[in-house]
Design a protein with these regions (language model features):
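Outer-membrane beta-barrel translocator domains and adjoining extracellular loop/strand segments
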Residues: 1-4, 42-50, 88, 92-100, ...
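Extracellular loop and loop/strand-boundary signature of outer-membrane beta-barrel proteins
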Residues: 3-8, 16, 52-58, 66, ...
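Residues that define the transmembrane beta-barrel architecture of outer-membrane proteins
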Residues: 13-17, 24-26, 61-65, 105-111, ...
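Membrane-embedded beta-barrel scaffold of Gram-negative outer-membrane proteins
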Residues: 8-65
Length: 210
């Protein structure tokens, strides 16, 4: 059996700045935040092998910066649009080994949108999750996962006061894609570090409130 060698690590420290806005104007509302964190000795993990626990090491300097933005619009009682956008720029900073490479696992852009038609008595809501470009799989930035688009649909109906029926259909088109990654130092498409998105699935049930 393989045994991973112990690598001593030091505590990480960081300076973080964040600015944002939250508000409502008429039938539209928003919540936007911009952030930046400069980190020293960030503790990063990478996969050694399938049967070996992930190993942790200290990076020299890294930077996490990005935008988290949510927007909602409800022009009528029966129509509501919601959208969430995440922009993530996580990278090494002038690292001796990795230069300014991006950190793996987290994709650069993620967009989630939902359009709800109806009210609490009866509604249907198509939704989409779009990752235009997948995340890097390794710290050397040699292998990147592909982007994907997941389509879903949810619906609900009120049977009586406090009792609702619901249905949640996910990945309607049966999209096959990589949804998560266990980071590696150097990866290939054959590396055992990839985890798929949820397969096509339909859930339904009853919610009761007392």
């Amino acid at each position: 059996a393989q045994i991973a060698a112990f690598a001593p690590v030091k505590e990480q420290t960081a300076w973080t700045a964040e600015i944002g806005t939250r508000g409502k104007m008429g039938w539209a509302s928003w919540d936007i935040a911009l952030y930046r964190a400069n980190i020293k000795r960030e503790m990063l993990q990478f996969t050694v092998g399938r049967d070996i626990p992930a190993t942790t090491f200290n990076a020299d300097r890294t930077r996490h910066q990005g935008v988290e933005a949510a927007f909602s619009a409800a022009p009528t009682d029966w129509l509501r649009f919601r959208q969430i956008w995440q922009y993530s720029d996580f990278r090494f900073v002038a690292d001796a080994q990795y230069g300014n490479n991006r950190l793996p696992v987290v994709p650069k852009h993620v967009l989630r949108s939902e359009l709800r038609l109806g009210n609490d008595d009866l509604h249907i809501a198509p939704n989409v999750e779009w990752v235009p470009q997948g995340a890097w799989a390794d710290y050397r930035n040699t292998t990147r996962t592909t982007g994907y688009t997941l389509l879903g649909l949810s619906a609900g109906a009120r049977v009586m006061a406090g009792v609702d029926l619901f249905i949640d259909a996910r990945n309607l088109t049966g999209e096959k894609a990589i949804g998560d990654v266990s980071a590696a130092i150097l990866a290939s498409t054959a590396s055992a570090i990839y985890h798929p998105v949820e397969r096509r699935a339909i859930y339904g049930g009853v919610r009761a409130r007392f």
